[in-house]
């Protein structure tokens, strides 16, 4: 059995609206539509601010940078993440000077294997400063159990 990595979820209506926007707008980034989207997203997610970026890769880099700066995480600190993830989850960890620690995957939900997570937490005790929980392939990780 094979599963497609992703299916095209963009409808013809979406394509039409996007092409109309491109043809009639002189600003594609940081314009009024982006600010309106950020505001609407903040309202929906019940957060004070939102920042729209071009990709999940950029979002991961921005998130890792912001969290490590906010909590004053020193370089070379260990950040735990799943072994089953995209390179764009791991790349910001390395790019920003941190050390990734990989947790095995529970094949039932493609999230952390809880027994391995416990083993790693005992092995590294206070060394792991951040747990980066990827929600792989649209599957929501059960973060409340971590």
Language-model region placement:
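Generic structural signal for small/hydrophobic residues in well-ordered secondary structure
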Residues: 18-19, 41, 59, 79, ...
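Active-site phosphate-binding strand-loop segment of PLP-dependent enzymes
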Residues: 108-146
């Amino acid at each position: 059995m094979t599963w497609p990595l992703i299916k095209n979820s963009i409808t013809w209506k979406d394509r039409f609206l996007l092409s109309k926007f491109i043809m009639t707008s002189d600003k594609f980034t940081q314009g009024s539509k982006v600010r309106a989207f950020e505001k609407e997203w903040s309202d929906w997610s019940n957060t004070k601010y939102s920042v729209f970026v071009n990709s999940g890769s950029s979002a991961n880099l921005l998130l890792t940078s912001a969290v490590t700066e906010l909590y004053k995480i020193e370089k070379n600190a260990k950040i735990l993440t799943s072994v089953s993830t995209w390179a764009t989850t791991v790349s910001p960890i390395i790019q920003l000077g941190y050390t990734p620690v990989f947790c095995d995957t529970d094949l039932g939900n493609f999230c952390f294997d809880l027994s391995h997570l416990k083993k790693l937490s005992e092995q590294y005790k206070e060394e792991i400063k951040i747990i980066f929980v990827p929600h792989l392939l649209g599957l929501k990780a059960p973060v409340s159990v971590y």
